[in-house]
Amino acid sequence: MLTVISPAKSLDFESPAHTKRFSDPVFLSSSRELITELRKQSPAQISKLMKISPKLGELNAQRYKAWKPPFAPDNAKQALLAFRGDVYMGLDADTLTSRDLTFSQKHLRILSGLYGVLKPLDLIQPYRLEMGTRFRNKRGKDLYEFWGERLTTAVREELSGHRNKTLVNLASNEYFRSIDAASLGHRIVTPVFKDYSNGTYRILSFFAKRARGRMASHIIRERINKPEDLKRFDLDGYRSEEHTSELQSPDHLVC
């Protein structure tokens, strides 16, 4: 079983990593292609492209300019420990043990606009490039066309090495669009987190992001490798509501 999550815009490259272990991104040459194109953009163009402030446009122009492989612990950081934000607050990666990290390295992947697919301990350098950015490049009109079938193929190949070939989708819609579900060839389970608000259960973005991180953490810490075991998830007031059959399907787990 393999779980995918989204990255985060918030980054932490100041705090020291609590592990010395690291790995390398598999699509680094493709990342280099994107960086080459991004360096042609002025800070003002970056601000317009990403709909961010001039200050953030300048920051990211500097990041693209400074981006330089090969990566090492002195100029980069493990992806799972570098990303911050709601999902990662729920995941709480800084408290994962060495054995947890070993399990996550096989069972968790992070989808990324710049790096494609990341293992938790893959080294990255600071960047901002959301998957939904309409950045025209040599391969197409946006990042979905840039990555094409490559991310689907990578995930499919990862799953081929697992006994249980189920993909658990804890990523946002923006990022999971980079995976062609129809051609993946394996079962996909998508947990859905709902909160009671104004008389009904619905998805509240902030809480849903945090809950996706909590479930990813639960999968890692409990060594869950069968999708049916996800029904035991019971944290922060979320739990599988199997009795509400109208909300359930074999490929959706409503919490």
Language-model segments: which ranges?
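A contiguous strand-loop segment
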Residues: 23-81, 153-157
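Conserved small/polar residues in nucleotide/adenosyl-binding loops
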Residues: 242-248
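A contiguous pocket-lining binding segment that forms or flanks enzyme active sites
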Residues: 135-192
